[in-house]
Amino acid sequence: MSGAPHIPVLLAEVRGVLRLGEGPGVVVDGTFGAGGYSRALLAADPDLRVIAIDRDPTAVAAGQELAAAAGGRLRLVQGRFGDLDAIVRREGVEAVDGVVLDIGVSSMQLDRAERGFSFRADGPLDMRMEGAGTSAADLVNGAPEAELADIIYHFGEERRSRAVARAILEARRRAPIATTGALAEIVAGVVRAEPGSGIHPATRTFQALRIAVNDELGELNRALHAAERILRPGGRLAVVTFHSLEDRIVKQFFSARSGRAVSASRHLPMAERPVPRSFTLVTKGPVGPSEAEAAANPRARSAKLRAGERTDAPAPEPLAALAALAALPPRERGGRR
């Protein structure tokens, strides 16, 4: 899909949730990417200001043309959305009217082979959104077998995680695994493609490594709490997710913050008592794409939108249960052989 335009998913639904056009305000686009949401937000309301954040310096550089054209209505900042409250305050804004988060990897990252996110075109095994720190190649070539199995099982939900980890170790003993194509071939040797699914055997393993390299679930956890701290009463938080690990964290956050106890489960070892409601639910469950959008934009098919409206209750302490969801739980180690 290289060269295809980026289409923001569930755009009409996000615009409706954020109630654009109801007067001047400030909205945070915590995941700028190719600028799809920011561009749509600016076009929908001439009185709106947008503070857009992206940890990827390439995305920030590419967005400067849009920022210049917005005439001061768009402020584009390089940073992590987990720090969005601090970033917003550094911009001289104490509270905002809306926050939108589109979680996960962007199409502009997937489409560039040199970024090393995708198995669809061979490139260096990198996956770093910021271009610094531990790369996927570092992890694949340096992590112990058990750690690789844990990462692939929990963050990729790959049932064959032990077999994949074992195959990676056998391959790296012969030579370092340096490219996305090499890793995809190793995984395809032990994971069978599901007939008729159209899903590449390496999909779950690549997802797991990307999440681990960029601490994506930890960032999501921090971003939800940061949004809670920076939204004014009546402000709204809209979060679009693309797989069950992300959606589970968002669902538990809104459940707990809307007055429901976070119940114990195999993912949440301890229940947490309800706290004063900091959010009311805007969406009573996940909102998915229309049939027309799913047909026009394949990326939208797995998208889910959840949203909440901030109350005037003080922001409580961060939920320990969400931090547990974002980490590797010891009892989920290994997966099946």
Curated annotation (Swiss-Prot):
This is Ribosomal RNA small subunit methyltransferase H. Specifically methylates the N4 position of cytidine in position 1402 (C1402) of 16S rRNA. Residues 289-300 have a biased composition (Low complexity). One of its GO terms (molecular function) is rRNA (cytosine-N4-)-methyltransferase activity. Gene3D superfamilies: Putative methyltransferase TM0872, insert domain, Vaccinia Virus protein VP39. One of its GO terms (cellular component) is cytoplasm. GO terms for biological process: rRNA base methylation. The keyword Membrane does not apply. Residues 286-316 are annotated as: Disordered. It comes from Methylobacterium sp. (strain 4-46). It is an enzyme of class 2 (transferase). PANTHER family: 12S RRNA N4-METHYLCYTIDINE METHYLTRANSFERASE, S-ADENOSYL-METHYLTRANSFERASE MRAW. Its main location: cytoplasm. S-adenosyl-L-methionine binds at G35, G36, Y37, D54, F81, D102, Q109. Its EC number is 2.1.1.199. The gene is rsmH. It is found in: Cytoplasm. Belongs to the methyltransferase superfamily. RsmH family. It catalyses: cytidine(1402) in 16S rRNA + S-adenosyl-L-methionine = N(4)-methylcytidine(1402) in 16S rRNA + S-adenosyl-L-homocysteine + H(+).
